[in-house]
């Protein structure tokens, strides 16, 4: 029996799709328009929209089209809807004036529970080639090596999206990737290590996972944070972690606020 697609409408305070998309952690989301996206995750895709409440413009609601099973067992966790962002946001604002603006501008950001392998590749690529080039590479890898889906969705007719490929799939289609500079050779070595040598990437580079969806926040994530902290906040990373973040449960969220602020600088008023 085919599962029934339902429309789920929920109020989620301190959750903003556009801010999450602009934070650099989900370059493979498909943006339909402001506050409306298609989210590919493994072998599923979700059409999701965020709307202001008609009677209270301080409140937003999420509208999702999916099966009941997928809502509770896939997307609720993927979007990190259990997290109390209001409490964490208030704690981060109390860190001091230099964090108040990033916390206000990114107060709807959640850290997504992404596919481990995809999150690992994304985080590594960001450290190698930066956010913009990493986003291009991630979509190219998925389109060349992943499984293609054409899915009918209300209001958008048919949409094409791609599953993120496994290491085996990347090795099979690696020759089709074309010239991607140092990304090509690194990606091939990584996949060979995983397939042939059982490289446990989920247990290495712990700081990468704290940033991109692994939610292991015992230590502040240091991926690219050294330069960002020194350049924009005048802080040493180790001192920042020890001194500022002792009471913050989701330390990765602090970094996402900073990254979102840096990637989306406010326009200067002339």
Where are these regions (language model features)?
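HhH-family (HhH-GPD) DNA N-glycosylase catalytic core used in base-excision repair
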Residues: 1-270
């Amino acid at each position: 029996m085919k599962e029934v697609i339902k429309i789920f409408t929920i109020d989620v305070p301190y959750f903003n799709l556009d801010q999450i998309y602009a934070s650099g952690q989900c370059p493979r989301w498909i943006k339909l328009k402001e506050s409306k996206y298609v989210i590919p995750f493994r072998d599923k895709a979700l059409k999701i929209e965020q709307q202001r409440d008609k009677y209270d413009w301080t409140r937003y609601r999420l509208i999702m089209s999916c099966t009941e099973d997928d809502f509770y067992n896939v997307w609720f966790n993927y979007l990190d809807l259990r997290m109390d962002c209001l409490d964490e946001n208030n704690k981060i604002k109390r860190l001091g004036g230099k964090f108040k603006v990033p916390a206000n501008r990114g107060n709807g950001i959640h850290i997504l529970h992404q596919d481990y392998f995809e999150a690992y590749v994304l985080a590594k690529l960001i450290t190698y080639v930066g956010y913009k080039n990493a986003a291009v590479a991630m979509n190219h890898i998925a389109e060349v090596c992943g499984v293609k889906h054409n899915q009918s969705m209300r209001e958008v007719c048919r949409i094409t999206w791609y599953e993120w490929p496994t290491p085996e799939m990347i090795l099979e289609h690696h020759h089709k990737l074309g010239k991607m500079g140092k990304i090509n050779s690194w990606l091939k070595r990584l996949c060979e290590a995983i397939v042939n040598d059982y490289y446990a990437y989920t247990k290495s580079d712990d700081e990468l996972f704290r940033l991109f969806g692994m939610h292991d926040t015992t230590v502040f994530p240091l991926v690219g944070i050294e330069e960002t902290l020194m350049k924009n906040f005048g802080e040493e990373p180790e001192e920042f972690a020890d001194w500022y973040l002792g009471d913050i449960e989701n330390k990765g969220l602090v970094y996402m606020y900073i990254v979102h602020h840096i990637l989306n600088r406010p326009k200067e008023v002339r």
